């Protein structure tokens, strides 16, 4: 169908943009494993990825990538990843340098950073994510493995009934929403409209 053909053409374009060269689906069997360590090192170099990712065995993780899983995407899914989730190199005119399987492994590595057997756990996470058996929330997909490890979707806070508490809650909301966290505030402790406030 035309939709699948559009997705394949977009995939070709993404590969060319990220790797700087064209590659067929068959060639990606080796190219993904070769490109993956370069992707991680470049992300660390430009300050987007957490330096701790360099401690992983890149050869092992690169070998675990399954290029055929790129073909699971329809056009809209692939375009959404490109537009909203892939890492962007602002130093090179906004070039996306992340590919679908690199994206899933980057997220998996971020989730496995504190695991004892981190390569094994990263591969397990990668396999459930890249097969769509499980999908993490948007903040996790945005931030896992990056310098900002804010992975939660929602934060619930209680605002205290004083000037410091109200403005502290506003500040916390701004910082949390900066990295895609959803917010819920309990304003119950704050006195009602028209209530007496001691002043000068």
Where are these regions (language model features)?
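Extended catalytic cores of very large enzyme megasubunits
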Residues: 1-200
């Amino acid at each position: 169908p035309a939709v699948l053909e559009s997705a394949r053409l977009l995939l070709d374009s993404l590969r060319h943009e990220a790797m700087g060269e064209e590659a067929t689906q068959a060639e990606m069997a080796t190219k993904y494993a070769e490109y993956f360590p370069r992707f991680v090192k470049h992300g660390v170099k430009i300050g987007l990825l957490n330096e701790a990712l360099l401690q992983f065995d890149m050869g092992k993780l690169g070998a675990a990538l399954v290029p055929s899983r790129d073909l699971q995407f329809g056009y809209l899914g692939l375009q959404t990843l490109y537009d909203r989730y892939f890492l962007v190199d602002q130093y090179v005119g906004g070039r996306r340098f992340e590919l679908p399987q690199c994206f899933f492994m980057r997220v998996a590595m971020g989730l496995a950073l504190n695991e004892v057997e981190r390569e094994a756990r990263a591969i397990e996470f990668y396999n459930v994510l890249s097969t769509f058996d499980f999908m993490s929330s948007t903040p996790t997909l945005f931030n896992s493995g990056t310098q900002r490890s804010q992975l939660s979707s929602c934060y619930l806070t209680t605002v205290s009934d004083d000037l410091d508490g109200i403005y502290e809650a506003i500040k916390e909301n701004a910082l949390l929403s900066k990295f895609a966290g959803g917010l819920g505030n309990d304003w119950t402790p704050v006195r009602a409209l028209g209530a007496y406030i001691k002043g000068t």
